[in-house]
From Swiss-Prot:
Keyword Thylakoid: no
Keywords: ANK repeat, Repeat
Origin species: Acanthamoeba polyphaga mimivirus (APMV)
Protein name: Putative ankyrin repeat protein R734
Positions of ANK repeats: 77-105, 106-136, 138-167, 192-219, 220-242, 243-274, 307-337, 396-430, 468-498, 535-564
Keyword Repeat among UniProt keywords: yes
Signal peptide range: none
Length: 652
């Protein structure tokens, strides 16, 4: 029994004539996990008949009913007959699936999580009543989070059936103490022997939750109060003291003592050593007011020469410049001891005040240029460079420009623009190299980078700076499946590259650009008169990607007696299912020896699942998967050597 899972926004059929279907045993794994716990956007179609011999892909299909993809619990078929569409809101759907084989351990575990998340008590009750449960401990590490309106009922059910469902009540405590809306569930949990003092983390506790529990008669213990006192949450500490808890009855180490409690202990007669005071103020600097800490040190007679570096570094990271100056004035410490941390922190946090403090103390801030990549503030980086360029003689070195390679933020291209506009460079070629960085960025980011790249190129043109590699890079990206970026740059017009077919026989850039731009009127005559171009694989690949069947047939005809060229063309058809089908229908050639390589190219290298699926259905699983390690020998593939040439801008 197989099912097809379809999202609401997916069409009822597809253009590729094949469908992914799921065996019943894996149905919960798929819709609970792979479809991201989304119960509102999925159809589950009950497939009654899988008979690919009735409907074929291009009139050819292997004899097996279905072709499995190794290591994935999905199957491909080109024929489905939908007998029923199942409703996930109906309990009968789950009963139907469970009684027909959807009961493997992983699927049940995910189903329980899904039911908790959506509050499906009807399904949970059915699972418990019929002893269809996860294996022991499978959910021990899962937090049972629910988004349902009936969360109180869901959590009560989990508590009552925690052993059956594979949860532990302790896992609930963190959730139930995070928001007041869970107060009823928390009370029910506490009435079933869960203790708040078993909580590992206390910082998130809400005082209104504790107030409600106290009003309802819940008894807190000293163990819980001790854990609360180890936090810096003064509101919680005050609450416990107001209801009668005494900090003198517990033992708290100085390195876990906030200033508020430390002052209370002082009032009660406790004395602290210089080392203990250092520990207290270092712990408190994260959350306590700086001047409260200073008042505590004055009260205890603290000698600031005993301070440790951790305290100073915390002031640098978390405090104000005034606090840093005050501390350094109180100690005999030299600023140079902390200057690296000051400047690097300033760059990370875009702190101009710290940079100016270092600058005014004669620190050479130029040596920290290599840290600029870690700032995401364009204005700060510009300001930093302006500070370096205060005499108008600053020229960027490779360290500044190199940060363009450390990320994909638009602000990094803005800095290149600033360097170009202000002539802050010695060699423009090094900057120009980095203008091409968008080509190495995932194609999904193209829309983000297009405007700034256009500005950079226009700026280069206005300054008469040549960008010699741009044309081959455009072509390379088009041939390497980064086509959206290439098409973006093709919009820039004839200022970037020459028009028409070029006269130099050795240069095929314009041939490829014309194919990419679908301006192929002259290409056939030109190529026909240049036999040295007949077997050029880059021309064939551009033709396949552009799906120009007329030019494709022309190139195949030129090479009809060249079996190696034809086989390699078949492999390159992995880029287009349309061209692959056309090749199969047009060329009478045994290319079975190349099917596996074509599949690896489609599935693993360019991620063209449509072509990979077509090959599985067309040629059969056995032909492709004669080995369990077909992806391990990719280095020996023809296509890898060819793609490497393209990356090197060599269009062979």
């Amino acid at each position: 029994m197989y099912f097809r899972i379809r999202k609401l926004d997916e069409p009822d059929s597809n253009d590729n004539d094949f469908y992914v279907v799921i065996p019943v045993k894996d149905i919960f794994t798929w819709f609970c996990s792979i479809y991201s716990l989304d119960k509102t956007s999925i159809f589950i179609h009950d497939i009654n008949n899988l008979n690919p011999n009735e409907y074929t892909i291009q009139q050819v299909i292997p004899g097996s009913d279905i072709s499995p993809i190794k290591n994935l619990n999905e199957y491909l078929t080109n024929d489905i007959i939908i007998t029923n569409t199942l409703d996930l809101n109906d309990l009968e759907t789950f009963i139907y699936l469970l009684t027909n084989g959807a009961n493997n351990s992983e699927g049940i575990k995910l189903l329980v999580t899904w039911c908790v998340y959506y509050g499906r008590l009807d399904v949970l009750n059915y699972l418990v009543d019929n002893n269809i449960l996860p294996t022991e401990n499978t959910l021990r590490d899962y937090l049972p989070i629910t988004i349902s309106e009936n969360h109180d009922e869901v959590y009560k059910f989990i508590i009552d059936h925690e052993f059956h469902l594979g949860y532990k009540s302790n896992n609930l405590s963190w959730i139930l103490t995070s928001e007041y809306k869970y107060i009823n569930s928390l009370k029910y949990t506490l009435s079933n022997d869960l203790k708040l003092s078993d909580l590992i983390f206390m910082h998130h506790l809400k005082v209104e939750i504790l107030q409600e529990l106290f009003s309802s008669g819940y008894e807190f213990d000293n163990r819980l109060f001790e854990k609360i006192c180890r936090t810096t949450n003064i509101t919680l500490i005050k609450f416990f003291m107001d209801i009668g808890f005494d900090p003198m009855n517990i033992v708290i180490q100085p390195n876990q003592l906030c200033i508020y409690l430390a002052n209370i202990l002082l009032d009660s007669g406790r004395q602290f050593t210089q080392n203990e005071i250092s520990q207290i103020i270092t712990f408190s600097i994260v959350s306590d007011d700086y001047w409260d800490i200073i008042a505590f040190t004055e009260r205890t007679g603290y000698n600031w020469n005993n301070i440790n570096d951790n305290f100073i570094n915390c002031i640098i990271r978390r405090g104000s410049l005034d606090h840093l100056k005050d501390i350094l004035n109180r100690t005999s410490l030299n600023i140079n001891r902390f200057i690296d941390n000051i400047v690097i922190t300033a760059i990370f946090d875009s702190r101009k005040d710290l940079i100016m403090y270092a600058y005014e103390n004669n620190v050479d801030i130029a040596k920290y240029i290599q840290s600029l990549p870690y700032s995401n503030d364009t204005n700060f980086i510009k300001w930093y460079i302006e500070l370096l360029n205060s005499d108008g003689n600053f020229k960027s070195d490779n360290n500044i420009i190199n940060f363009i390679n450390h990320g994909t933020g638009t602000h990094k291209f803005e800095i290149l623009k600033y360097l170009l506009e202000n002539d802050c460079y010695e060699d423009p070629n090094y900057i120009i190299e980095h203008i091409c960085c968008p080509f190495n960025i995932g194609k999904n980011n193209t829309d983000i980078h297009e405007p700034i790249v256009v500005e950079l190129l226009n700026l280069c043109e206005s300054k008469q700076i040549d960008v010699p590699k741009l044309t081959p890079i455009i072509i390379s990206n088009y041939l390497l499946s980064n086509r959206k970026i290439s098409n973006t740059l093709l919009k820039f017009g004839t200022t970037i590259y020459s028009d028409g077919i070029i006269d130099n026989d050795s240069d095929i850039n314009n041939i490829l650009l014309n194919i990419i731009n679908n301006q192929c009127e002259e290409i056939k005559d030109y190529v026909y008169n240049k036999p040295q171009l007949w077997t050029n694989k880059s021309i064939m690949l551009a033709t396949i990607i552009s799906e120009n069947i007329d030019l494709f047939d022309f190139l195949l005809e030129l090479n009809r007696d060249n079996n190696l060229y034809l086989e390699q063309s078949f492999i390159l058809c992995a880029n287009s299912i349309k061209m692959l089908k056309h090749f199969v229908n047009s060329i009478n050639l045994d290319i079975t020896s190349r099917v596996r390589e074509t599949y690896v190219y489609a599935y693993s290298i360019i991620k063209n699942k449509s072509v990979a699926s077509y090959l599985l259905l067309y040629y059969g699983n056995d032909m492709i998967y004669d080995s369990d390690n077909i992806f391990e020998n990719q280095k020996n593939l023809f296509v890898n050597d060819f793609l490497r040439e393209i990356k090197n801008l060599n269009f062979v």
